[in-house]
Amino acid sequence: MYREFEEFVFNNYDFNEPAIKRKYYHSKRVSTISKKIAENLAWPLEDIKLATQIGLLHDIGRFDEWTMYKCFNKYMDHGSYGAYLLNKEEYEKMFNIKSYDKQEVLDTVYYHNKLKLPASLKDNKFCKLIRDADKLDIIYQLSQREIVMENNTHVISKEVFKEFNKGTTITNKHIKTYADKVLSILALVYDINYAYTLELLKNFNYINKIYDNLENKEFYKDYFDKINKYIEKR
């Protein structure tokens, strides 16, 4: 599984590009996290293997996205594109996707980055798990560096404030300022499905590490307190 993924990345993309390297390691970490959560949930071995595989492949659309556009989230929906790639016979063979697992793989990859799952998949355990693992690693990455926005102001947009206080994730197009970005990161926690994912988030102290890296900490204190209380209550 990992060998095929490594060959796919190294043979088709420029690994010297930081964005490609970052997505490669993100994919491997999400795969590891997915396996860990599935094991904690005592899933059958075959389901654990599938969760591990989908975790590795969830961002496969990102590599072409960067190569074509040199940016993320502007011109392409990488979840939809990733599912399109994995639906091709050559990718199915390359990654040894079993025919009876294919629809599960396609659905999970397609919807992993959407604001919410459709009603038909809201209880799908693979979709829920991969979304958890992905968010946990995104929060980890943001805990390791400063948040950078072109509009570096501590002003929260009306739409972002409303969504945050409703307890929902933030719509990407509403994120316009540094403050919006901070709240959008915190709001990822609202969409975490499994208690064990929240336990990992708490144990690794990612939320407080993000707070420690902030500019103008006092402005954000109440929002961080709210999220930490939410984690404790869940």
Regions found by a protein language model. Give the residues of each.
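Short alpha-helical hairpin
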Residues: 1-13, 54-60
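Glycine- and acidic
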Residues: 14-18
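Acidic/histidine metal-binding catalytic segments
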Residues: 42-53, 92-111, 122-129
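His-Asp-centered metal-binding catalytic motifs of divalent-metal-dependent phosphohydrolases/nucleases
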Residues: 48-74, 78-82, 86, 103-115
